[in-house]
Regions:
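N-terminal beta-alpha supersecondary unit
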Residues: 1-65
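Residues at secondary-structure transition points
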Residues: 31-42, 70, 74, 78, ...
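DPxDG-like acidic metal-binding loop motif
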Residues: 60-96
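Acyltransferase
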Residues: 177-229
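Conserved hydrophobic/aromatic positions in well-ordered beta-strands
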Residues: 17, 124-128, 210
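Stable alpha-helical structural segments in soluble proteins, enriched in small hydrophobic residues
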Residues: 47-51, 86, 104, 185-196
């Protein structure tokens, strides 16, 4: 039985979570993204003190590794790597989009499409089923009124995240569902424990966040004519 620290600074708010295996024993968050760099160390210290657990008892650290805020990702990854290096414990990286789906799994939908705002009409996105199987790989796309049209003909898709508002203004399909769902470090726990059991670890020395830079030149226009299921 082991303690795990989970860090998320990828989107709007920063949060840290302490779990005893899959059981959450402590959680703290900070809603201001611009304060993540100054808050994260203090937040972790306060979390551990409130829980009465020493850092030396941690078995691993997990971090939301992107896509997301460039600055936020750097802050979270640097913090996680520093702790893992100092404590000589494994680093576990979790895709931010998949973390978001964990927060939405109990919703009534066949497929889940988290969207992270990029710029203009662009979003980082992917599509997953209830078992977190990747239906459409994470990528950056330019939204239009034909995006996801082929899948929406036969499947109900839940769109959520801080980029989904842009798509809600475009799409008319009855199979397109929208809901505000907040994801945070607590939603890293299950995947992180599974990765730990399977010894799926990142390289502490060379691991970098997934910024999604490659998709900016140019961004994929939309999902129509591609990614059929």
């Amino acid at each position: 039985m082991s303690y795990f620290l989970h860090i998320d600074t990828a989107i709007v708010s920063a949060s840290v979570c302490l779990s005893f295996n899959e059981d959450v024993v402590g959680f703290l968050s900070n809603p201001l993204q611009k304060d993540s760099a100054s808050w994260i160390q203090t937040g972790i210290r306060e979390l551990m003190q409130n829980s009465g657990v020493k850092l030396q008892l941690l078995k691993a650290v997990s971090v939301s590794a992107g896509p997301g805020s460039y600055t936020g990702l750097r802050v979270g990854m640097a913090t996680a790597k520093g702790l893992c290096y100092a404590l000589n414990i494994p680093l576990i990286t979790i895709n931010t989009l998949k973390m978001m789906v964990v927060a939405a799994q109990n919703e009534d939908a066949e497929l889940f499409c988290p969207m992270i705002d990029a710029r203009r009409m662009e979003v980082f996105t992917a599509v997953y089923d209830k078992r977190l199987k990747e239906i459409i790989v994470p990528q950056n796309i330019v939204l239009d009124d034909k995006s996801f049209c082929e899948i929406l003909e036969t499947k109900k898709i839940l769109f959520f995240g801080n980029g989904s508002n842009k798509f809600q203004e475009l799409i008319k399909s009855q199979n397109a569902l929208f809901k505000k769902i907040e994801a945070d470090a607590k939603h890293l726990v299950t995947q992180s424990i599974e990765a730990f059991k399977n010894q799926i670890f990142a390289d502490v020395a060379y691991c970098e966040p997934f910024y999604g830079k490659a998709f900016y030149s140019p961004a994929i226009q939309s999902f129509r004519h591609k990614n059929k299921i």
